[in-house]
Curated annotation (Swiss-Prot):
It is an enzyme of class 2 (transferase). The keyword Hydrolase does not apply. Its cofactor is Mg(2+); Mn(2+); thiamine diphosphate. Catalyzes the thiamine diphosphate-dependent decarboxylation of 2-oxoglutarate and the subsequent addition of the resulting succinic semialdehyde-thiamine pyrophosphate anion to isochorismate to yield 2-succinyl-5-enolpyruvyl-6-hydroxy-3-cyclohexene-1-carboxylate (SEPHCHC). Belongs to the TPP enzyme family. MenD subfamily. It comes from Histophilus somni (strain 2336). It holds the Pfam family TPP_enzyme_C. GO terms for biological process: menaquinone biosynthetic process. It catalyses: isochorismate + 2-oxoglutarate + H(+) = 5-enolpyruvoyl-6-hydroxy-2-succinyl-cyclohex-3-ene-1-carboxylate + CO2. Homodimer. This is 2-succinyl-5-enolpyruvyl-6-hydroxy-3-cyclohexene-1-carboxylate synthase. Its EC number is 2.2.1.9. Binds 1 thiamine pyrophosphate per subunit.
Amino acid sequence: MSASVFNRCWSKVILETLSRQGVSHFCIAPGSRSTPLTLEAIRLQENGRGTCHTHFDERGLGFFALGIAKASKKPVAVIVTSGTATANLYPAIIEARQTDVPLIILTADRPPELLECGANQAILQQNMFAQYPIASINLPRPSQNYSAQWLISVLDQACFRQKQGGVIHINVPFAEPLYNANNDEIDLHPWLSNIQSWLTQNKNWIQHQEQHTEVITHKYWDQWRTKKGIIIVGRLPSEQAMGIAEWAENMGWIMITDIQSHVKPTLPYADIWLANQTVRKKLLQAEIVIQFGSGFIGKRINQFLAEFKGEYWIIENNQKAVDPYHHAHTRFNAKPHHWLRAHPPMRKKPWLLEPLALAKFCADFIKQRVGSNLNEASLAHNIELLLPKSNSVLFLGNSLFVRLADALSQPSANYPIYTNRGASGIDGLLATAAGIAVGSEQTLVAMIGDTSTLYDLNSFALFKQLNQPAIIFVINNNGGAIFDMLPVDIAVKEKYYRMSHYLEFSHIAAMFDLKYARPYTWADLATVLKQAYSRRETTIIEIKINPNDGSNIYKDLIDKIGHALIGV
């Protein structure tokens, strides 16, 4: 029996196992050594049990898979060939690990006899992603000495560990030949005989029973709910954010929200008004802070958390540490709505009114300072004007803009907002946005900085695969404007931090055959958006602005609000 046939049998069992674990998207890069895996993924697609996506750039492919997994909330498989193709997945693996996004990385490998002997495209791939995967499976070369049941069991157990997210790396060595295997030879191979009934049924090999862990009410909750408290809400899935705002309002507690929280802010612009030392000192009089979620963007929110020394509780639905300030705290590993049910509120009047007064003052002052020109700050402040009312998702890239959006906007509750704030890199943002469009099957709006766009230009090719409207805002402030916030000499900052490029993006759009517009006013933008939303294709909207506009407005708002005198 040809080795090419058994390579395919081995790959069939791997992908059949992953399919039963919820994998329906297979992201495939070109390569010969991964042929057995690629052809079996194609077979699943032909049978209506999966969708294959392709991209020529493995780094972008990894982030594309990350985006699909974020939006679909299901594991996504990535298939790549051996060599440095595998290493290009590392940034996406890091981001997935930091944010608990389920990815399954399938790296084809040379067989052991071709390693460390000068063979082409053969590198050391076993455990190459170090501690970032939750499981690293180094499979042997395909051999009938290992039963199909063993292979399924190994993969099934790893997938069970992935139920709360994270990355699984499966390294699969294949010896040649890799081609010319007949489907009938594969399906009728004796090695598969003991699992034929399993292959005809859509069920997991190992049936894990759900563990229902009831949230226990804190034994001193009746006392703590009478105290002065603050609710801090960080990054949460939209389905976990329900009920938090109402609960906080009933308690009369201050609630501070991150733009990633999917909770409508009752005290918007927190990253601005927390610069006010008078109000911050009064907030520090709180007796308890309860944190839902994590990954706070705002610098002032993080400074407040670092300063707070009182009782601290964290509600987070995984085992990860999410307290960079190392409070002595009480940890509840629970979904927020389960925790809220176990900790009923006590209706009280607000214990502190100054934040509300300051937030209202901020609203008027921000509107005045931002003005009516089309710039970073006005886009962030009026971000809801850019978005369709329904059936759409928003992706915010890692640049100055995400900080402005967090500080200046009031997003609607439960509007789907995605970010890559695990490692907060600027790599792979376009690819992630394209994946989110695929995973959500909804209209996409993405706000991405110019340097981030230049870093991931290859990924514009992915947008040709979309079948829905997608709007990519490229915020072109001629380099890394986020570094304008640093206390560095201007000349040094320009050359070594900002790195101005003096480029524009119309020719990039033409290269990838995407629509392009460059509006100069809000009226121009309204016309462009109306056209873009009517087309089932991608439009690049370049907002070219003065380099320092956004950072200057941001710094000025923080300075002015920081010294404002607010009476109640």
